[in-house]
Amino acid sequence: MSIKLTATTRTDLGKGASRRLRHADLVPAIVYGADKEAVSLTFTHKDIIKAEGIEAFYSSVLDLEIDGVSEQVVLKDLQRHAFKARIQHLDLLRVDAKHKLHTTVPLHFINEGLSEAIKNGGIVYRTINEVEVLCLPKDLPSFIEVDISTMEIGDTLHLSNITLPAGVESVELNKGEEHDLPMVSIALSKKAPAEEIEAETAE
C-alpha cells in the first residue's frame, strides 16, 4: 500500500512560527538526508492524522510531494502533544534506492486461534512488538509475521526463529548471538484447572 503525503515548503522558522502553524491546524516538519539540503515543510494536520492511522505509515517508504515535486521518504520521528490529540512535528528522511535503511518494522503475531497451547490455558506474553531491520528501500516490509500456532506451553521464540523477507537483515542478530532477543513466549495461566497443570507436567 502506497501512502502519499503532500507538503509545502516554509521559510518562516522558529518556535513562534511553529506555534502559529499549529494554531492554524498545520504541522511543521523537516525532510533531510540523501546528501541534499534539509527543507522545512508544512502539512495539514488532518492529512497527517489520516495517514498516521495506517500502521504502514510508520514502517514504509512514503511518497512525499513538495510543491509538486515528488520524492521518497521514511518517517524518522513524530512528536505528539503531551495531553492533546495533536501532532506537533514530523522528521522525514529521504531514501536512496542504492543505500540500505536502518529502521523499525512492527511484528504481527498470527494464528493464535490455531494454537493448542492457548486452547489448553496458555497465555501469550509478547516481549517486543517491533524489530530493527536493515534493507534497501525496495525490500522494506510493512510488517513481519510471527506464526505462533505450533508453540507449546513453555516455549519462547527468539529473533533467530523468524524467517525474514528476502533482502532484510536483523540489526540485533548482526551484532551476534547474545543479541538474539526473545519475542514471544507462552506460559500456563495461573487460572488453569489443576488437572490441566498435571497433564502438562506429565507431558
Swiss-Prot record:
CDD domains with a match to the protein in the record: Ribosomal_L25_TL5_CTC
List the InterPro entries.
Rbsml_bL25/Gln-tRNA_synth_N, Ribosomal_bL25/Gln-tRNA_synth, Ribosomal_bL25_b-dom, Ribosomal_bL25_C, Ribosomal_bL25_long, Ribosomal_bL25_short, Ribosomal_L25_dom, Ribosomal_uL5_bac-type
Keyword tags? Ribonucleoprotein, Ribosomal protein, RNA-binding, rRNA-binding
Superkingdom of this protein's organism: Bacteria
A GO term (biological process) for this protein? translation
Stored NCBIfam families:
bL25_bact_ctc, PRK05618.1-5, PRK05943.1
What task does this protein carry out? This is one of the proteins that binds to the 5S RNA in the ribosome where it forms part of the central protuberance.
PANTHER family tied to this protein: RIBOSOMAL PROTEIN L25/GLN-TRNA SYNTHETASE, ANTI-CODON-BINDING DOMAIN-CONTAINING PROTEIN, RIBOSOMAL PROTEIN L25_GLN-TRNA SYNTHETASE, ANTI-CODON-BINDING DOMAIN-CONTAINING PROTEIN
Q: How does it assemble?
A: Part of the 50S ribosomal subunit; part of the 5S rRNA/L5/L18/L25 subcomplex. Contacts the 5S rRNA. Binds to the 5S rRNA independently of L5 and L18.
Q: Which family does it belong to?
A: Belongs to the bacterial ribosomal protein bL25 family. CTC subfamily.
Q: What is the name of this protein?
A: Large ribosomal subunit protein bL25
Q: Which organism is it from?
A: Psychromonas ingrahamii (strain DSM 17664 / CCUG 51855 / 37)
